[in-house]
Amino acid sequence: MEQSVSARWLKRYRAFFLILLLIVAIQLFLAYKSLDIVGGGSGSGFDAAEAPASPPPPHAQARVQPPARTKLTAQQLGFQPECDILAREAISALQRAKTKDCREHIAQIACAIQAGRFYAPQLRSSCPAGNHTANVSLGCFKDEKDRRLLAGYYSSSKTSNSPAKCVELCLQSGYPYAGVQYGRECFCGYDPPPKASKLPDSSCNTKCLGNAKEICGGFYAMNIYETGIAKFTAQLAATTPSEETKRVRIAFLLTLNGRALRQVHRLLKALYAPEHVYYIHVDERQDYLYRKLLELESKFPNIRLARKRFSTIWGGASLLTMLLQCMEDLLQSNWHWDFVINLSESDFPVKTLDKLVDFLSANPGRNFVKGHGRETQKFIQKQGLDKTFVECDTHMWRIGDRKLPAGIQVDGGSDWVALSRPFVGYVTHPREDDELLQALLKLFRHTLLPAESFFHTVLRNTKHCTSYVDNNLHVTNWKRKQGCKCQYKHVVDWCGCSPNDFKPEDWPRLQATEQKSLFFARKFEPVINQAVLLQLEEWLYGPYTSEYANLHGYWQSLYHHEDVHGSGDDLARSIGDSVMRLSARQAKLYPLELIELTHYLHRDQYKGFLVRYRARGSTGKPLHLETRVRPTQQGKLARNARFSKRLRNFEVSTDFDQKEQIARNFGKLLGPQSDLLLSYTLQANADSGAASHSYNLTLLWIDPLGRLQDFNELHVEDSTSDVINHSKTLLKHPITPGIWTAKLIGRNSIYAQLKFLIAPLAYYKGYPLAKSSDAEALNAGLTVALPEDFEMPVEWQQHLQTDDEQFTMREESLAKGKMLGQELHSWIDGLVGQFFQLRESCVVEADSEVSLPLCSDAPWSSLAPDPKSDVDALLK
């Protein structure tokens, strides 16, 4: 009877028993896995989004092996490497590197690492350690689950734990004490264990999983060792100097890139004083900025430009090389200075120069760097410090894992620093017998973002450790969700983060610096937002007068005829020349030479680009003119669709900045080599009580021949706030020149349509097109991106031309694609005239032959007064 009842119960509740059994099994599995934690912090407040990337932990990486190794041949590489390269990442880098020199460089380093003769395995810190001695055992101590003896850091390893390895790990992380427990566990801490917790040595009796001949604590029993370093405490900076304190002089090291000349002038105006030094490094590729800033040397005896220039890429080792070279140049100069502060064109002061000088004068000999503020082991992994990187071909190649040298503390954070002259002299002139500094220089020359860790690590491990102040004098506008989009994958084998530009809505962050020892903020870009800069300047220096000329205007060069021309200028010159011809024709002039293209913004609204050129009138006299041009794209939105009514800024462009949520091709210059994308803003649903909708849409990319070249499937969700979206194409280059159409369609309707121009090119690699074969290769554009076997949905056919129409247009496109000279110019002018509106013109010098205003009187002109960026005002 009992068996019968039991059977009935089991039968009736079988499903519940099975679920209960499954839950128990899952709990047991999770309990087992919890013992295998690789490493964890102890409430350090670490924010995973703050670091440049999220690679797997090093122990996990060591266990992952590629399924099969690819062997590279000398024929593939173009040379015979000195070893059979084994590292999977090195092989990948060699396969992707474009030049033989780069491949040889990668192979040389990979072989040296493989042979164990590249990195120093052990280094010795010279920072005073007090009475601490590495690997000295303090004994066995009783631990508690809720009150850990060493609560700084914890890791667990089933295969490699030992006292020596735990000591090495804790020392690297900056902890004076290391403890092993339960065979597999390693703990780190700042404070010595209390004597009351001492246990007999026999209580620690568990063998180490990494070395069975050694003991690694026991059950809540911990063997504790000294790591050989003292507890590190950053110096507290003084805030005000004494009356007898000598005022310091500062060397401002400006490391510049891009074409924001007026913003650089504005920064110099805010920082300038005759007693300080301004040393400027301009990226080797930025010919325009270097040429324009070179003019300052003859006007200001304390402004100099570096003659030895580097091409610095995001995360590149060349950045550290450049900084050290510039610092060495400053040391070798005749200038007297006490501190060097590195800044970029994106920095701006949040306090006056006098306040900065007062602060540094109160802290002579100290070094200001900002630490990562999180657990060191996680910082190492997130920063990629446990990887080897090689820079060549303007790319940072990851070529494999590495073990950092034992015996030193690893530190890092921001690469914006304020360093004292003695420390700068130390790092730029390493003695041959200084093994520590020599090894660190070699280590960080093959490190991602080296300037973010080099100065910190050198400070922590040398006699200069007592000068370390955990403050780099900067406030940075981090918005992790926007700034960490892997936007640098094209130049580095890693995911990177960048801070956002300050905007007026970020003003409270800037105001909050008033009572803090913060003197600079970043980033600022007037091409994105100038209003916040004006607000900051008025906060520091008082309000501008109402008569101040062109206060809300901003100009930034796009092209200049004196630049070293390359293929990067072909499109701008082709369109610029066309606008010049159209403008000159309108004024009944003969065009001579395109001089400059300049972006113009007013109150942070893009007003078009300015075309400055020379022309000749009927009398033969040369004239100098400028025309404002407004790019247009011809869009239509469905009138009756609720979705269409909420679409804004529906446009095709290139260079979409996910961080700032904007396409940086402001002039809408699109050509056969452009990587197209469509961006749009979907406004929030005005009816907050309405049901939320989602939309499944298709974006069709239709070329001038009426062919479908690509399509994107879009899934759009309603949102309570405005949302900016973008969608990229996968078109094959060269793209067919002419008038393209982007159509956003649903199942039965068209929501939006946009016609935009792909301009033909009149230049090839910096020179006017002279061969029909070159012209055809660039401008015929007969390739189709979609595969031949692609089955076109029937409902899409209505949006395309028929086969006969496509054939006719193809023949016309082929004929136009071979055009040269005047024929080519006429074709380009006919297209440019439809998509670029000539708004207004001016003349540089008055002339009776043209009835145009003077450019100096036209507030939009690049030649109009701009006193906020007039660096010559410093001479008055």
From Swiss-Prot:
The chain crosses the membrane at residues 15-35. PROSITE patterns: WSC. It comes from the Eukaryota. Residues 134-228 form the WSC domain. UDP-alpha-D-xylose binds at residues 283, 312-314, 415-416, 498, 522-523. Residues 48-67 are annotated as: Disordered. GO terms for cellular component: endoplasmic reticulum membrane; Golgi membrane; membrane. Divalent metal cations. Calcium or manganese or magnesium. Pathway: Glycan metabolism; chondroitin sulfate biosynthesis; Glycan metabolism; heparan sulfate biosynthesis. Disulfide bonds join 83-111, 127-465, 484-497, 486-495, 842-855. Residues 36-876 are lumenal. It catalyses: UDP-alpha-D-xylose + L-seryl-[protein] = 3-O-(beta-D-xylosyl)-L-seryl-[protein] + UDP + H(+). Its cofactor is Ca(2+); Mn(2+); Mg(2+). Glycans are attached at residues 131, 135, 342, 696, 725. Keywords: Disulfide bond, Endoplasmic reticulum, Glycoprotein, Glycosyltransferase, Golgi apparatus, Magnesium, Manganese, Membrane, Metal-binding, Signal-anchor, Transferase, Transmembrane, Transmembrane helix. Belongs to the glycosyltransferase 14 family. XylT subfamily. This is Xylosyltransferase oxt.
